[in-house]
């Protein structure tokens, strides 16, 4: 399994306080399993800029992919 076997969708949204929160969806393409978000998943932020929120979400997504490659979740 490689990083190409995953789809990472990283974006952001604005919270009620006007700050930016990262949004993330990570899907394992081989079986369609959504690895993130999950029940109780952490909130990614808030951050002062949309770019920081998006970058944090993308970085978290890459970490999830690396972790799943090393130790696949069934």
Sequence positions of predicted segments:
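A short, exposed loop/beta-hairpin motif centered on an aromatic-Gly-Thr core
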Residues: 37-52
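Intrinsically disordered, low-complexity regions
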Residues: 1-4, 31, 35, 60, ...
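Hydrophobic alpha-helical segments with strong N-terminal bias
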Residues: 7, 12, 29, 33-35, ...
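Short N-terminal "domain-start" leader segments
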Residues: 1-25
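A short, structured beta-strand/loop element
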Residues: 16-41
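A short, charged, amphipathic alpha-helix used as a generic interaction element across diverse proteins
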Residues: 48-65
């Amino acid at each position: 399994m490689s990083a190409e076997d995953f789809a990472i969708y990283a974006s952001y949204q604005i919270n009620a306080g006007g700050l930016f929160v990262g949004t993330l969806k990570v899907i394992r393409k081989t079986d369609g399993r959504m690895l993130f978000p999950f029940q109780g998943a952490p909130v990614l932020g808030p951050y002062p800029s949309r770019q920081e929120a998006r970058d944090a979400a993308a970085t978290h997504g890459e970490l999830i992919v690396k972790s799943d490659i090393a130790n696949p979740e069934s």
